[in-house]
Structure formats: C-alpha cells, structure tokens
C-alpha cells in the first residue's frame, strides 16, 4: 500500500505506532524505504520543531524559524493540506514541504489559544 502513496506526514507517535520502533528517526527511515515521508517535529524529543523529509534517498531538515510557538488543534492536518495544495500548484515535494512549514509556523504564532488565525 505504501508504494502507491506519494508522501505520508506522521508525527513521532504515529511513526512509533506504524513501525513498532521506539527510535522515531529509525522508524521514519525504515518507512522511507516504501514511500516518501515528512516526519513532523512537534512531538519529537530528539529534534523538537524540526520536520525531516525523507525523499528519494535524501534527508532534509526543515528547521523552525521561531522557537516560541503555541500549539494548535489540527496543525498536522493543516500541514498535510498545505503540502498537497503546493504540490497541486506544481511545486516539487521539497519546495512544497518547505513552503508549508513556513505557512504553519505563522499559524502556530498567530495567538496563544488552541485555535489558529490565518495571517
């Protein structure tokens, strides 16, 4: 099934559940043998806030521009939707992930509540 998917966007907890591996990085790397993956950084203990793209045998870290963010409900869904939208606009997976990371960071900084404001 994974071979027919272009990109999956799990967080650290989801990688552990999908692979049974407590080493999130290794679990994501193992998944990348079957499909492209962006490991979201919000729940990571090894690289908090860093999203890592495993794509065609390479790894790209998207570092957060801000260390102070406010958690939001649905931020993972916003990220995957933003990536899909950027791909639909003709951007590569790498560019789509980077643009989407920056978009989501704006939402995470938008206010102190769990609801995002689009800025």
Provide a role label for each language-model segment.
Residues 59-60, 86-100:
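Phosphate-handling active-site elements
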Residues 19, 87-88, 108:
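Hydrophobic residues in alpha-helical segments
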Residues 58-66:
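A short, charged helix-loop
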Residues 1-59:
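Conserved phosphate/ATP/ADP-binding segment of small-molecule kinases
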Residues 14, 41-44, 65-68, 100-104:
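Glycine-rich beta-alpha junction loops
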């Amino acid at each position: 099934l994974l071979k027919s998917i272009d990109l999956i966007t799990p967080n650290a907890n989801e990688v552990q559940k999908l692979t049974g591996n407590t080493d999130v990085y290794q679990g994501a790397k193992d998944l990348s043998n079957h499909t492209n993956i962006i490991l979201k950084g919000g729940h990571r203990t090894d690289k908090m806030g860093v999203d890592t793209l495993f794509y065609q045998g390479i790894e790209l870290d998207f570092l957060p521009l801000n260390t102070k963010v406010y958690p939001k409900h649905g931020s993972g869904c916003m990220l995957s939707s933003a990536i899909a939208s950027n791909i639909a606009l003709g951007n590569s997976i790498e560019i789509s992930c980077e643009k989407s990371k920056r978009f989501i960071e704006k939402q995470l900084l938008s206010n102190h509540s769990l609801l995002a404001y689009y800025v």
